[in-house]
């Protein structure tokens, strides 16, 4: 199963990390897309490490990040700088989507 996680707030980092780890432990793939305040998590080490985990793909809305002055320089190459197209792909490819 592919689990999509749509992150549009920076208030639930612990939940995001826990859900990702639980899904991976069950053998599921995880697709994440961040926008709005969710892009503020990009700079946190705990969040950034998730993209290096096998079975996890991550992207974020560049427009949201720029609008909130979120620094995207130095992000791991595994985190895709994208747009709402990446959100659409996640929603198409995921079997289930959680919004946090």
Task: Name these PLM-found stretches.
Residues 47-71:
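A glycine-rich helix N-cap at a beta->alpha junction
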Residues 3-14, 35-41:
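Short, glycine-rich nucleotide/cofactor-binding loops
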Residues 1-2, 100:
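Absolute protein N-terminus
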Residues 70-100:
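C-terminal structural segments of small proteins and small subunits
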Residues 18-19, 45-47:
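A short acidic, amphipathic alpha-helical/loop segment
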Residues 3, 29-30, 58:
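Hydrophobic anchor at the start of a short beta-strand
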Residues 12-27, 32:
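Histidine-anchored nucleotide/phosphate-binding helix
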């Amino acid at each position: 199963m592919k689990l999509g996680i749509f992150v549009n707030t920076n208030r639930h980092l612990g939940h995001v990390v826990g859900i990702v780890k639980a899904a991976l432990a069950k053998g599921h793939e995880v697709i994440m897309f961040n926008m709005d305040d969710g892009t503020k998590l990009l700079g946190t080490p705990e969040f950034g490490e998730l993209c290096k985990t096998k079975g996890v793909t991550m992207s974020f809305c560049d427009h949201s990040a720029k609008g909130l002055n979120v620094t995207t320089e130095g992000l791991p190459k595994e985190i895709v700088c994208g747009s709402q197209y990446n959100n659409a792909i996640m929603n198409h490819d995921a079997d289930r989507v959680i919004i946090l």
